[in-house]
Amino acid sequence: MSEWLFDLGNSRFKYAPLDGTRAGDVQAWAHGAEAMDTAALSALPSGKVAHVASVAAAGLTERVLASLRTRFEQVRVVRTAAACAGVRIAYADPSRFGVDRFLALLGARGDAPVLVAGVGTALTIDVLGADGQHHGGRIAASPTTMREALHARAVQLPPTGGAYAELANDTDDALTSGCDGAAVALIERSLQHAARTLGMPVCLLVHGGGAPPLLPLLPTAEFRAALVLDGLATWATHSAAP
């Protein structure tokens, strides 16, 4: 493959070949906040063009870019644009709109209005009209981050473990139920508001490494594991080379 897509998130690194207008088979691994294993970097593919999106720390981003520049003839880094591929961002200053949210909207663009919920380090929610107009969104802590924050302030509360229950009868289950339930409630409230605002039903797309535990609680949701990479593929095919 001559063109590849790279998505460097806060805690996971994903990449895939550009396959037409979509992402091909995805490879992914976790990374530290400030570093990535040297062996992992040395195993990256090579080709003609690398299309890169990053919300990771500046130092880690530059290290990955430096590695890619030794493997590709051209490395293109995505920046959020006011408009791309029929999507128009609601932010007055598009540079303040995260590139991961931007690409998720590009990947979600279709013939129906959609609410896009990304569950990673943060929980991000964005509403996109059928005409491609972004109607804004929300940012909150994801369930994983909620658990970590509670553990940091009250060490006796475990950072992981437990199963969801509507009314839990032990601490581990209560923590999972509260944190997962808070995320689901915010998504559901946003979905209801979007439907009222747009005057029609709104589809729900969910993506991100923290999404699978929420899916049983969101029966109408469609899970799109490669949504950001699909959006990056859209950006790659719609934006002119610098």
From Swiss-Prot:
One of its GO terms (cellular component) is cytoplasm. The keyword Transferase applies. ATP binds at residues 7-14, 121. GO terms for molecular function: ATP binding; pantothenate kinase activity. Its EC number is 2.7.1.33. It comes from the Bacteria. It comes from Xanthomonas campestris pv. campestris (strain ATCC 33913 / DSM 3586 / NCPPB 528 / LMG 568 / P 25). Keywords: ATP-binding, Coenzyme A biosynthesis, Cytoplasm, Kinase, Nucleotide-binding, Potassium, Transferase. GO terms for biological process: coenzyme A biosynthetic process. The active site is at residue 100. The gene is coaX. Its cofactor is NH4(+); K(+). InterPro entries: ATPase_NBD (IPR043129), Type_III_PanK (IPR004619). It is an enzyme of class 2 (transferase). Its main location: cytoplasm. Gene3D superfamilies: 3.30.420.40. This is Type III pantothenate kinase. It is found in: Cytoplasm. Homodimer. It catalyses: (R)-pantothenate + ATP = (R)-4'-phosphopantothenate + ADP + H(+). Substrate binds at residues 91, 98-101, 171.
